[in-house]
Amino acid sequence: MATLLEKTRKITAILQDGVTDLQQELPYNSMTERLANVIDCNACVINTKGELLGYSLPYNTNNDRVDQFFYDRKLPDEYVRAAVRIYDTMANVPVDRPLAIFPEESLSDFPKGVTTLAPIYGSGMRLGTFIMWREDGEFTDDDLVLVELATTVIGVQLSNLKLEQMEENIRKDTMATMAVNTLSYSEMKAVKAIIEELDGEEGHVIASVIADKIGITRSVIVNALRKLESAGVIESRSLGMKGTYLKVLNTGLFDKLAGRNF
């Protein structure tokens, strides 16, 4: 059996290995799996909205409530509201308590089931909650030492995610601004008319119809779309006689156009 020191080293190694994949739908699955293996439990990481960021289930609990959570990738709102009010680690919550991951009706199936919740902080902000549970056997003091270390590691990783998301939002906003600024008045007018024809963020348009509708030439529309596509703001595909398929890749375009007067 691994010693506390060995387990501690396995957790701190996560920071060195860079186990998150921000391109994945659940970017922290690998990290959560490693933590669950070290602490010897089922585990998941949620953000402050209750959205699932990663999970690992080495022990199958046959729990409908938990299964539904992973299917929806979000915990019930009332559970999340209670969880974010926890400011220190809450250990070994029994099955019959509201914050137990086990449904109350499963008390007879998992009489010794316990849940431990630990808040995740980063850069002075609450970023989420680390939830762990076992069917049989409480979390010991040694386990809780590992939990405290794990939440620190998760906090660093979530801070990195938040920073990358901020940088990505700034990049998209800058690209949308630059793309719109390259358009002439007529081209901006054309793009706004095109956006109004789309069904949300994508759809198909017929350039000649829009040109006639707003009183410009078809070439103005073609030039405007070419500029936006080269800036990575939209993508387009010819549909032949049916017109052109368009998809807005950078939704910042909507705000930039809305701020212009025509």
UniProtKB/Swiss-Prot annotation:
Outcome of gene disruption: Disruption of the gene in peptide-rich medium and exponentially growing cells significantly increases expression of over 30 genes. Repression of oppD by regulatory BCAAs is completely removed in codY mutant.
Locations listed in the record: Cytoplasm
A GO MF label: GTP binding
Gene3D superfamilies per record: 3.30.450.40, Winged helix-like DNA-binding domain superfamily/Winged helix DNA-binding domain
Induction: Represses its own transcription via a CodY-box in the promoter region.
Chief location of this protein within or outside the cell: cytoplasm
Regulation: Activity of CodY is modulated by interaction with the branched-chain amino acids (BCAAs) leucine, isoleucine and valine, which are signals of the nutritional status of the cell. Whereas both BCAA and GTP are CodY effectors in B.subtilis, L.lactis CodY responds to the intracellular BCAA concentrations, but not to physiological fluctuations in intracellular GTP.
Record keyword Transcription present: yes
Record's keyword annotation contains Calcium: no
Sorted UniProt keywords: Cytoplasm, DNA-binding, Repressor, Transcription, Transcription regulation
Pfam families per record: CodY, HTH_CodY
Region annotated GAF domain, chain positions: 1-159
A cellular component term, taken from the record's GO annotations: protein-DNA complex
Bilayer-crossing regions: none
Job description of the protein: DNA-binding global transcriptional regulator which is involved in the adaptive response to starvation and acts by directly or indirectly controlling the expression of numerous genes in response to nutrient availability. During rapid exponential growth, CodY is highly active and represses genes whose products allow adaptation to nutrient depletion.
Recorded family membership: Belongs to the CodY family.
Protein name: Global transcriptional regulator CodY
Gene: codY
